Amino acid sequence: CYLPAKEYVTPKVDVRAVIFNEKNEILLVREKADGRWAMPGGWSDVGYTPKEVAVKETREETGLDVRAERLLAVIDKRCHPYPAGPFYVYKMFILCEVLGGVLSGSFDILDQGFFALDNLPPLSLDRTIPEDIRMMDELRHHPDIPFHSIRMDSIQFPYTPFHSIPFG
């Protein structure tokens, strides 16, 4: 049983799939809501693990089948340069590997594609900011880092985590 929001307010969880191809391009989807681009993903659903959300959202938004590889980062949206919004949000970024499928649309996605990191389209800034993409590109090259949960402006590489959590 879940308590109504008026009883105990908790953060919403936004899960994003981080997917790069062999050309080092990142997969983005064009959101119907604002016509701008973001990493595949969305609100976490009750009954799904974060890994399952990343896989489900990627399949629904892109037509691709992926495997969730590892958690790259958990961030508190208010500690990063996102526009103000109505919810308190934690964002989870999960590195995924493409297993198959064909890029195809969905009811709430206008388009999808892979983009070079130095030639990104206009981003849906409530969902994905340029700093997200830069940080995920850096973190994916450091498998020794279990996950990242500190402020983006304080990250330095090589990064030695002071804590870790299992993911799998």
Show the residue positions of the predicted features:
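Nudix hydrolase/Nudix homology domain
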Residues: R36, F107-G168
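Generic secondary-structure transition motif, activating predominantly at the C-termini of alpha-helices
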Residues: Y2-E7, C79, I133, D137-H141
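Unchanged
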Residues: S44-A68, I75-D132, G168
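Short connector loops at helix/strand junctions that flank enzyme active sites
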Residues: T10-V15, K32-D34, F87-K91
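Acidic, metal-coordinating catalytic segment for phosphate/diphosphate chemistry
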Residues: C1-R16, E22
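Conserved Nudix-box catalytic region and its N-terminal flanking loop in Nudix hydrolases
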Residues: N21-E60
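Residues embedded in well-ordered beta-strands
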Residues: R16-V18, E25, F93
